A protein has these predicted regions:
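Catalytic palm subdomain of template-directed nucleic-acid polymerases
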Residues: 155-173, 255-262, 266-295, 314-325, ...
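Basic, alpha-helical interaction scaffolds
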Residues: 339-385
Length: 385
């Protein structure tokens, strides 16, 4: 790292951002930057030596995990967002190498598949939602039987396998010393929990018997490392799964895609014209989603079945125009194993008029927007009061 990069990090850091369990927050570093920089040069020299020789300082081994309610006023233990607070020097390493250098190198050399929308420049959550609406519309216009599956990966940042993610980072150009340091840092952490009642006295840490995995939400390298794992998953899905195929009547313009990914949310789709090995739409959907579940599990992750669901779009004649068929008009089910050693579970199937919440939007496969307008009206009324 260059000293100028360290200075630039300090200059752009927000003083209100929580950091450094030791108490060395960004305000201290900004004050030091006003002088002759001799102390900052010493700190940067220590930082550079630690990175080059894979040394994790004792002060860096403490992480405070702050638990924030996902639902205001409902402090349920399974509905807490865990944010890791680490020392600011390590946050500098994470932002410089993973966010700036690795992500930029991956984008420049087209190392990330087009299916990835989260954590990338010039990509938005709205694009993934619009894609889904367009898939729904095209399938309805072409009267093509289709399956659309929405999957949520459980606590994705906290289940990244550290050693595997280090290897995946190498394909994006991560230096060996960086991958080695990141692994050593994660495995050396002693975690404390902070809630509204204070910081816990008891701690938990990595051990060979119970290895603590995950890159930790709140640390700058968590996003790029998850995109790396998710990108591996999307490449496997694209190779072995059916996906969708839409084209114009002349065949001059076409779209072939398997899934769209936004962080932990995955939207998988299958159309009638891509079915493999004489499968029907249910068999193909089960094959593709089981491939997805096994791939995630092999990388340390797991599907959140309670937040997942699927549609089967099919058509029945109603007087003159065909309409989207209900569940009882085309019976079938999809069962998947969330992990290699788990029991099969039946996935939740949705009626065509039921809106599924996708990245904050409520979209129904039959094109109905009633649920979305109800939610928007409620939000507007809350803002107005």
């Amino acid at each position: 790292t260059a000293f100028e990069e360290f200075l630039d990090f300090i200059k752009n850091a927000k003083e209100a951002t929580s950091t450094s369990p030791s108490g060395r927050n960004y305000s201290h570093y900004k004050s030091l930057s006003q002088g002759d920089h001799c102390y900052l040069r010493t700190i940067h020299g220590i930082l550079e030596t630690a990175l080059q020789h894979n040394i994790v300082l004792q002060r860096w081994k403490s992480t405070v995990t702050t638990l924030i309610e996902k639902d205001d006023g409902k402090p349920c233990i399974h509905r807490m967002r865990a944010i890791h607070i680490i020392e600011s020097e390590v946050q500098f390493i994470a932002k410089l190498f993973y966010v700036r250098k690795l992500m930029r190198n991956a984008e420049k050399n087209n190392l990330i598949t087009d299916e990835q929308y989260g954590g990338r420049n010039r990509r938005q959550a709205q694009t993934a939602v619009i894609n889904k609406i367009l898939y729904y519309n095209l399938s309805r216009q072409m009267r093509m039987t289709s399956a659309f599956i929405d999957i949520d990966a459980r606590a994705c940042y906290d289940r990244i396998v550290t050693s595997l993610s280090g290897l995946e980072g190498r394909k994006w150009g991560a230096p060996y010393k960086l991958s080695n340091f990141t692994t050593a840092f994660i495995e050396s952490q002693e975690y404390k929990i902070r809630t509204g009642f204070g910081i816990s006295k008891d701690t938990y840490e990595y051990s060979d018997a119970q290895p603590t995995q995950g890159s930790g939400q709140g640390i700058a390298w968590a996003g790029p490392r998850w995109i790396n794992s998710s990108d591996t998953c999307s490449r496997i899905m694209r190779k072995y799964c059916a996906g969708v195929h839409y084209h114009d009547p002349c065949g001059g313009n076409e779209v072939r895609k398997c899934s769209d990914y936004f962080i932990d949310d995955t939207a998988t789709a299958i159309t009638q014209n891509t079915l493999q090995s004489d499968n029907d739409i249910f068999q193909q959907a089960q094959h593709d989603e089981q491939t997805h579940a096994y791939t995630l599990n092999a990388m340390g992750h797991r599907i959140e079945n309670a937040k997942s669901g699927y549609y089967i779009l099919h058509f029945v004649r109603d007087k003159i125009l065909p309409s989207c068929g209900l569940i009882h008009e085309m019976e079938g089910s999809i069962t998947i194993q969330e992990a290699f050693d788990s029991e099969p579970v039946v996935m939740k199937r949705l009626q065509p008029f039921q809106a599924h919440r996708t990245l904050g939007c409520h979209v129904a496969i039959n094109g109905q927007s009633r649920r979305q307008f109800i939610v928007l009206k409620k939000k507007i009324q809350e803002w107005a009061t």
